[in-house]
């Protein structure tokens, strides 16, 4: 495989038109989006889809295994496109064959399964930067495996192959380009291993994972001696569509598949089922013996339109390589230049010291990085990805399906990773920082249609949210003329959310409401669960859930549910009995043999699902998601709030009282069981959530002050004041005198009492509420914007967490043992806080 070192990077040089013109016509979905995840998949052009549509509507394609005219047309097109694909990679069809597979992983598995079927098994070696799918091959290697952690180890191993005389079968696999950080490893290894193999008895084959590489660079297999035995790739990485992969096989290495046992339709010439089982494999070509069943012939035909469109727009992969290298270098330089007010760097980039964006043989257009604040503390990857998402910037975070490369870059050992797993860390979760170090990486990857605007937008995003400015002082000083014991607060409003993540039911003024140990009566007792996965739905993924509005009719003992925007008269209504065993036809099917396992905020629970088709149809039709209503079971299986987490949050106040972490203290020994754990139903973290009206007002002042005139009409609309409803609090408190507002004073509360006299109830403050992008969903329209999360990220970030509101828990013994009622509260009740600094 040949790579050009000397080609100078240039912005869209050689393209058919300026890239911005191409974007406007071919990629209209990029109008309001900055897409920086081309290593995951690049984007398909409008004209590709239109061309494919014309092809399908203008031709009749049958199953290529039949002999009809339509079937033979399909077979002919598949053969032609197979040849076109080989030529796209400069692979001589006399020397190579191409097998269509679902994706690169399917190609890897095809090779691994064939080697596993050999009588003695095989040995496997892989490079540390390998994709997870390459790592997984080691589980099939009977003769053992080895992970090579640097180039010197590989070179040393290759040099020793010539002296080995024992006969053995092996496979060495590595990526042409790391999908984590774009590092490119030496292409000479394939040629060197083949040369050593000719001088020894061992049979070491080479497998090149080119999936990441081919998305922006030309794969050149014209030098046969240097080409891998097997090359895997995915076409959607290059064209965006179709979802199809390929395994390119050197014909001289095809004997590897002779021990393959499984056969599918289309891969055999004859099969006997009577008497002794026997079959004859097709021998005419490698691809005929490996492509089991009917090929995805429509997807293969779409590949023809993909080649045509890509060539027309970008002319060549060399042009794409030059364009993306130019942008990557510019982005790297600008990220390196970002500094906080105190001179410390913002971005930690993970690059090999031998890599350079000026050298196509050493580096591709991918940037892997993490961020630090001005105090040198790491910023969690999940927070960055969430904030980027609400600003319509698409990036990737995590271990990026590259466990070895990520661990090596972050300095994690295998023992470290096992400790993290024992502590609860899983792929895709938000355990961002452990042992005061990041557990994952942020990734930006560029593609053929990326532009300078994408670079400028991302840099502006970092400058706005992650480049610290000189501090202007800390909010919430307690003034000396305010009596801490004067009950100057009251309950402005009370709300319950009968169905988790759906609309609020505002408790009417003058109505006293029961408080139970698990929170306000009827709060988050129901939820919607996906009928396929069993996972509870939430507004982060389905913002229209805000328009599902429950009403509690206690007189008739009904939960009345309407769907649609506020004040809409078109919404449908569903009534559910509040009794667990009802007489209504919709509720008689509840609970009886209807237990359903589900996942709520990471907890495994068993819910009681409504089995009536009318119930599931009501919610499914509105959301467009197959779901049904479910109810949390009786208190015998109540979930509990994590006091360990609350204790950490509790110390994260503006006085910065938290103790420094003790080196080597992770993981901590399990804490003793809490004799009085705080019960919760389907709420995320605590029985009740409290916010302050004055804090909402201050936040809205910050939102408005940050607003600037903008040519984008949508941006101006997103900067309007937000309603308190977006925080989905149970209790909103306000000062008795509006002129005496003290924003964020609740951050200093240790506990509070609501009411007076015999009706007074006490609540402990468990900690601050960590916010996510769900607060950006307008609870009246179901539309998602970028506020208030964008402003909270600037004004309320405390030690990596964006905080607003307080988790509270009622204290006391139930007055009513049957329903666990501790007492009642109502709108207008006095609120008397106690403070952290009180003795």
From Swiss-Prot:
Induction: By the nicotinate utilization transcriptional activating systems. The active site is at residue 401. The modification N6-(pyridoxal phosphate)lysine is found at residue 237. Its EC number is 2.8.1.9. It catalyses: Mo-molybdopterin + L-cysteine + AH2 = thio-Mo-molybdopterin + L-alanine + A + H2O. GO terms for biological process: Mo-molybdopterin cofactor biosynthetic process; molybdopterin cofactor metabolic process. Coiled coil: none annotated. Pfam families: Aminotran_5, MOSC, MOSC_N. The keyword Transport does not apply. SUPFAM superfamilies: MOSC N-terminal domain-like, PLP-dependent transferases. Residues 651-678 are annotated as: Disordered. Pathway: Cofactor biosynthesis; molybdopterin biosynthesis. Sulfurates the molybdenum cofactor. Sulfation of molybdenum is essential for xanthine dehydrogenase (XDH) and aldehyde oxidase (ADO) enzymes in which molybdenum cofactor is liganded by 1 oxygen and 1 sulfur atom in active form. Belongs to the class-V pyridoxal-phosphate-dependent aminotransferase family. MOCOS subfamily. PANTHER family: MITOCHONDRIAL AMIDOXIME REDUCING COMPONENT 1, MOLYBDOPTERIN COFACTOR SULFURASE MOSC. This is Molybdenum cofactor sulfurase. The lineage of its organism: Eukaryota, Fungi, Dikarya, Ascomycota, Pezizomycotina. The gene is hxB.
